[in-house]
Amino acid sequence: MSKTPTVGFVSLGCPKATVDSERILTQLRMEGYQIVPSYEDADVVVVNTCGFIDSAKAESLDAIGEAIAENGKVIVTGCMGVDENNIRGVHPSVLAVTGPQQYEQVVNAVHEVVPPSIEHDPFVDLVPPQGIKLTPRHYAYLKISEGCNHSCSFCIIPSMRGKLVSRPVGDVLSEAERLVKAGVKEVLVISQDTSAYGVDLKYKLDFWNGQPVKTRMLELCEELGKMGVWVRLHYVYPYPNVDDVIPLMAAGKILPYLDIPFQHASPKVLKAMKRPAFEDKTLARIKKWREICPELTIRSTFIVGFPGETEEDFQYLLDWLTEAQLDRVGCFQYSPVDGAPAEAMNLEPVPDEIKQDRWDRFMAHQQAISAARLQLKVGKELDVLIDEVDEDGAIGRSWADAPEIDGMVYVDSEQPLQPGDKVRVRVTNADEYDLWAEVI
């Protein structure tokens, strides 16, 4: 019997890239390849890269170099794959380079290096209907579209992943159903722009379980909300149509959680970023959302040190944060990106030391807000999904916490717990980012 061909896989970048990796791995497994966790056991290594900012590109190039040094046979795919000349300039020995979403080309490149076994592999029959997943069994990412129709001046995603292409809602719901049947208890909806879902299809009617459903965020959320699992929305653009899903959150159909990357608050900076400059309306909208759904958790990300940002702009942002009282916030110092429109706008660069100072002040400011908001949860009861268990106890997340990016809930329980368990707890303590609780 011939040796089963083996593939090593390195997946970098955001959850969208994770889903791409899962799709490639599933196809390779269906064709009889064995996925191995070490360089030395792999016949070929695939590196799924990130090319969003320069530091991500550097990390991708380092990962490619490590794979070449440890194995020698390397195929590169993902967002940085659109910059093949740069990759080959640094690593001329890579065997093939493909861009994001080019699943077939990646698999074909693997075929060229190590052909699939012509003998039937009985393990192929064990590939689960939901495919190979890189996340724990109890949660999974559900990608509803590719690409983005915006042209934010700091971003090159449209040039890497193209314009918005929405998946038909029936396909998305079928995948979600397979995940739920496989035991997934939390579905994280992701895309480049979740609130624009279906725009490119003109919200076309599709069919799900024999019923017509519009390819639109509201209808998607309504149907996902019937599946009996946590549904969490990520990468939501602050459009007015976001208002439509808040009642679903208030009714407990989907999690009261919105991930909205506001990026800044100063109208001048937002205009330079080519983002919606309606900060006053945004504050009013946040207030309205919380009136409808008091439990709503809002996560966001911001950029400080964008070219042209003044101290006045930055102070405006801090004041806006005080007013907005966001729950979960991340912040990045602006990083120049080759090919991003911001690099050609002739705006005054912000010196690195000022970027660092503003980042430090931003984080301290938001940390105080986060600590105060979490302190309000002490004494309250929450449902917690357990992610991991060690000798010190269990660690989980509430509806207010997305995996890997938000805080955690440290759970004290007299009964043994397992990852994927959902338990009711009472919060006993809080710090700036995390909670401590006991099972009730």
Swiss-Prot record:
It catalyses: L-aspartate(89)-[ribosomal protein uS12]-hydrogen + (sulfur carrier)-SH + AH2 + 2 S-adenosyl-L-methionine = 3-methylsulfanyl-L-aspartate(89)-[ribosomal protein uS12]-hydrogen + (sulfur carrier)-H + 5'-deoxyadenosine + L-methionine + A + S-adenosyl-L-homocysteine + 2 H(+). SMART domains: Elp3. Residues 5-115 form the MTTase N-terminal domain. Disulfide bonds: none annotated. It holds the Pfam family UPF0004. Its cofactor is [4Fe-4S] cluster. GO terms for cellular component: cytosol. Its EC number is 2.8.4.4. Residues 375-440 form the TRAM domain. The keyword Isomerase does not apply. InterPro entries: Elp3/MiaA/NifB-like_rSAM, Methylthiotransferase, Methylthiotransferase_CS, Methylthiotransferase_N, Methylthiotransferase_N_sf, NA-bd_OB-fold, Ribosomal_uS12_MeSTrfase_RimO, rSAM. [4Fe-4S] cluster 1 binds at residues 14, 50, 79. PROSITE patterns: MTTASE_N, MTTASE_RADICAL, RADICAL_SAM, TRAM. HAMAP family: MTTase_RimO. This is Ribosomal protein uS12 methylthiotransferase RimO. The lineage of its organism: Bacteria, Pseudomonadati, Pseudomonadota, Gammaproteobacteria, Pseudomonadales. The gene is rimO.
